[in-house]
Design a protein with these regions (language model features):
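Gly/Pro/Ser/Thr-rich low-complexity, intrinsically disordered segments predominantly at protein N-termini
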Residues: 1-110
């Protein structure tokens, strides 16, 4: 079990399957298998803008089939297959709009 990001080889490529095993407090994203550290907590201005934008989007999509999510929310971008071992990109956008319910599962968006 990996409990600290310093236990990982940052030159190695990782998958979503690896990501699910990590239990450290640092926020990260995977981009083509590479680990990218996210800022620990967005500043107040960022949160204020993000909150206002989420509110506007909520109103715009209220009567549509689209659903809105805010971070932390895993967005997995598969290239070859949908198995956890085949996914090398996992992002956590501030706001995510998903209009295809087939892309949602208990772990986020695929």
């Amino acid at each position: 079990m990996v409990t600290n990001i310093n236990q990982l080889n940052l030159n190695k490529l990782y998958t979503y399957a690896d990501y699910l095993l990590w239990q450290f407090s640092e926020r990260i994203e995977l981009l083509r298998g590479k680990i990218f550290k996210m800022s620990p907590a967005p500043n107040m201005r960022h949160q204020s803008i993000s909150g206002r934008l989420f509110g506007e989007l909520y109103v715009a999509f209220r009567d549509k089939k689209c659903r809105l999510f805010s971070a932390p929310f895993d967005v997995r971008l598969p290239q070859k297959g949908k198995a956890d071992e085949q996914i090398y990109t996992v992002l956590q956008p501030d706001i995510c709009v998903v209009c295809d319910p087939e892309k949602l599962d208990s772990r986020g968006c695929l």
